[in-house]
Amino acid sequence: MAGTIAEENADRATFETDQGVGVPVALGEGLDWYAGKPNRISSVVHRDEAQLNPGQNSRTLAMIEAVMSAAPSMGQKTALVLKDNAGVALPEAPWLLGAQGPAILEVWFPGQEDGNIVADLLFGKVNPSGKAPVTFPIAGRSFLDALAPEAYPGVLEEGKAAVSYLEGRYMGYRWYDGNRGGGCALQPNGENPCVAFPFGHGLSYTMFSLTPFAQRWENGVLKLETTVTNRGDREGAEVVQVYFGLSEPGQPPKRLVAFQRVALAPGEARLVTLSLDPEASHHPFDVFDDVTKAFRPAAGPIKVYLGTSSSLRDLRAQSLLAREE
């Protein structure tokens, strides 16, 4: 199945008559971008969204669920195209996430070439190779409001709405890695139960494999090497990502320090080398000292992660090779 439903027509086409693809049901949270209070990604699951958005419930999730429930094989024939400006909280539902759900294509706000871009991706003229620059969390689990109302959704200060950035160093994917809101302890396979799609995640119409990586120091610069192989029958690109885990107290479990995109023909293999210079401007080996207000070398051992997303499921880990003097 291929097609689009304009947002302004979604309610009418789907819910005004019994001949549509569904009937009115209570909407979940997260994908309802055009309601009066959009994108409610909260640790509290809002069962009655109509109370939050009286008369403006776009029923986006209910529409998707109705379409996906039309036939057992619908998930293999449906693509959900997201056009938005940020990560979206997704409900933990088999009709949306997993093998029975649709293919999900995040195109952000593509501009005037919207139609051409989406068509080229859906019909395979272009092979997707992007990686998520944000976390797509599961709705109702350990969002920032678990920290304090001042962090999310904000409070009134002198009559004006104000949000305080209380998460400190645990911004973005680090928040979920560090389980700062509770309830997000990693599963045995490395997956985070609060995350639908992790930072750095992105699929393709082909498949890639990475060999175990090697480390070496060269002229004071750390070199990480892995061989990436395109094991599918389509040309495509993978993004190799490197994270450092610092053992110093107060630091997130890991942070992105390097990445490199590699485009490969079907069956092609290529050695990829990522360089990490201790003197680089993003200070990969350092921490910021709140007392001295300056960067300094991190105390304790460093763990090196290399893979294809921020999820431990997609990473290999090694202890940092001692620097040659």
Predicted features, each with a name:
Residues 1-325:
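C-terminal non-catalytic regions of proteins with extracellular/luminal or membrane-system context
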